Structures are given as C-alpha cells and as structure tokens.
C-alpha cells in the first residue's frame, strides 16, 4: 500500500510530463493523464483592491425582505433572491479581476488552455477545504457534473446545460482536473461559459428524495462564511470560519472581515429603514432617489452618525423591466404587446419619481461592451400609437371605466412585483396606460412568493431585474427549450424557431467577431417580439451606513454592485467594523454629542 501512495504522490508532482489520454489504474484510482505540451498559467501580480488596514471582528446586521424557501441552490424554489448569499460563499476556480478583468486564481492555483480551444486544465489549491474540514479534491468537481445532470435535482436548465455545454470533467489526480466544453471559445470566455462549482461528494446522496432531504441542510462550502444559526422566518446568521484556508491568499486577504453577518427578515422596507435609523441594522441600500434625496436625512445623518455614499460603477446593466407572459392569450398578440409598451411613460417615471437620476434602459443586454447592440432603442411612449395598435387588434369598445373590451373580455392585466419600493413607479405607469384603455393592476407578493409565481410562469406581467453575467445569456431567457416549463428563466415563454437557431449558433460560434454579430442579431429579434419592456438603469450604487463601518480608501471597484455586500467573491467583503469607533459613537449618541456629517460621491469609475 505504501508503494501505491508513493506512486500517487509522484503522479501529482509530475502530471505535467505524462502522455496524453493514457489511463493509469492503480488500486481503486483511475487517472487520465494530461497532455505533454500544456503551459500552466497563474496571476498573483495584479493589484489587490482590499485594505491592509482592515480589522477582523464584529457583527454586521442587515435586512432581507423574506425568508428563503430552501437552502438548496438548485432545484425547485431555489431561484430566489437569497441564493446569492449561498453561492457567493462557494468559491469558483478562477474569477475576473473587478478592475482589470484579468483572470485571477481562487480555488485553483493554475490553469492551462488546451490546443482544442474548448478545454481548460486546472490545478486545485491543495490547501482548499470544505467548511466541515474535508479536503476539496477533483472528485468534488467530477461529482458536481453528476449532480447537475441528475434528474433527481429537478432542474431542467442545469440538466441540459451540464450535458450539452459542459461535456466532461476529467480527473487527472487528486488536485488536477480538466473541464471540457462543447465548442471552442476565446480563452477568457472558457472560464465563464464552462465554469462549474464543486459539490462536496461526501455530503450528498443522489436519489429520488434529494430535493426534500436537502431542502434545509447546510451544504459544505469553500468561502469565508457558513450558516451557523437559523431562526425560521426571522433570521439567518453566517459565521466567519476560524482559520479559513484562504485567509492569506492574494486577492482574498484583508477581506470578509466581520466575525458574523446576521440577515434579519424585515418584510416592509419602511420598517427596515426605521430599524436602520435606530442602529439595529448597520447599513441600508438607498439607491432609489426617494431614499437618497428624501428619507436619508435627519438627526442621525446631520450629526454624522450615519454616512451616505454614492459610488459610480461601470458594470453590465441588470435586465430590469416588464416581462410579458405569452401564455396569456391576449398577450400572445404582438399588437397588444406593442400597444402596452407604447402606453408606458417611463420618461415620466424618470423625471417625477426617479428625480432624473436614472436613464431609460435601451435593451435586455446593456453594458456588455462590443456585445451590446447600441442601435436598439426601447419603444417610446406614444398614446396615439398605442390606441391605433389596439384598434387594429380589435379592441374597439370600452366599458364604463374606459377599459377596452373584446368578446366580453376586458383588456386588464396583473403586474406582479416583489419590492414595494417599485410600487409608485407601477402606479404612475398604470395611470398613463389607462388613457389608452389598458388596465394594469399592481399585484404585490413578498419576494419569495414573487419568485415562485414568476418561475412557475403564473404571471401576466412581471416587473423584475435579472442578475448579470460577463457575456450575454440568451439560451436561458429566450430559447424554446426553456419555454412552457416551470423552474426555467424563460419567463416570457418565447418560442421562436428563428431565434432558437441564432441562439444555437451563438453558443457554438468560436470566432469572437462572429459571436458579437450574432449577439446583435439575437438582441434585435428579441426586441422586435416585444416580450420584454425595458425599464430604467443607473450607473451607481448608493448606501447609508453607520460610521463604524469602514471602507477602503477607494471605497469599491469598477464592478461593485454594492459596497456592503459581505460575501461576493469578486467585489464584496471590503469593509470592516471598527469596534472602538462603534463604542465611541454609541456613547456620543447617548450623551447628545455628534460628529461632522459625511456624504461621499465617488466618480472614479463613472462611465464617460
């Protein structure tokens, strides 16, 4: 047995020099060998974006609008707002630098590109550990592929993507793998399109009971924090790992500083803001103009206990707007969809409610560099055009309230939304739409119920914004494979053969110039279908925070969607808690003293 162990050790150390495709069978091990001529790369020279002045310790408290329906990150009900807190603590092999977009190592120490143009080889950091103390190995990546393909997880998008796009995960030794994609792509894109997060093989048992069994189990992770306490319906606590294995790694040191992060469920945003003003929460997102201009003021701001910051970023824009469900027989008529788009006065929303701070979002994928089709503009507000389209579609009569009628059916829709802060915008839009004879009724659901309603395709219209990626993602949102099915992201149920073909070509295209042209074509075709009505966009984030939360000198990065995200591996975890300042501040507050008010405007990364 000692001989076998020595052989395995030699294989790990000399894997660069082994001939291609040969399988070595030693005892119970089966390792595929690496190609001879690959060149390993790493990057520890890019500038770090944390502060060496950061202090560890303290507890950060912030609010979430609803309790998660599950702790699973795949399967039924997993596509919810809370999931990012779990995924952000599951480290990827590599990431893109938040300022330079260079590839940087995380769970992997090195990577190498295969000559086939579709395979990347990775060396997993041998120090990497799961939160339960087990080592992270190649087996966890091989198992991740098995899990993502399994019918037991009830996740059709994952099943298809990890079968048709991620072709294989090959184990070469305990800490070396290859990820094989379906088609060649530019090198940086390989890390994006064919990425796979590891799954702790020793933790999971894949069978028909998997969904129910793991609904409330805390899955081992590799990031800085793990869930340590759950109060059902009330709060979740994440605790920083003692002696986290990645503490001193480049790009991770001096980050993820609080000892604990408490996520408190506060369903009403107005109530949450009151908790924040009382010091029961440490930070509050005040990006919306109503909050920044109106609510973020008063004694705690004037006396310098609470600071304000507006930080400009340069990121891909969220696809935020109104999604129309084509399973609604009225919305299946494109003339009705175009009429609705023409009846929505977003410029009035920008001028009146958003105080001119926002702009109209042009199209679904905006801010993706050359991949963005800058020729596309949203349908402009035009009541006459809306009325003409409705009359062409046969909606010629009105009831006593002025709402159009056809075949005894009113032109009336519910618009689902999961954040009450958007309610004033929806109400203003619906008032204008009435002038064209369209009734749009606000239908508020708490965020968990809202996501469930949308992902099960039960909505007429839904107002939401999707998180962004580093490249346009068409297949999940607009391919017919994901239409008319629950638990997929094609929430418009668009199914169009021509668009399907373009999306498939886009996925398979190896030439970047051609891929960009295809992206422009897809965006144009989707825009013509009017299944998504773009809302608004902004190029900044705004936060209010108690003065004991300290940010680095530059406050954030080009990619910072939020300055106080405690977990995000790319841009989060930069702040820290100054316990002495907290003690000093609370004493001053009690005695009636104060400090200079602070408002920060950082335009370093403001787009030109």
Segments (PLM) and residue ranges:
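Alpha-helical secondary-structure segments
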Residues: 61, 137-144, 174-180, 223-224, ...
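Gly/Pro-rich hinge or "lid" segments in bacterial periplasmic/extracellular proteins
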Residues: 90, 97-99, 194-255, 260, ...
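Aromatic- and charge-enriched surface segment that lines or borders ligand/interaction sites
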Residues: 109-154, 178-180, 265, 272-275, ...
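Ligand-site clamp/hinge motif
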Residues: 210-216, 246-297, 430, 437-446
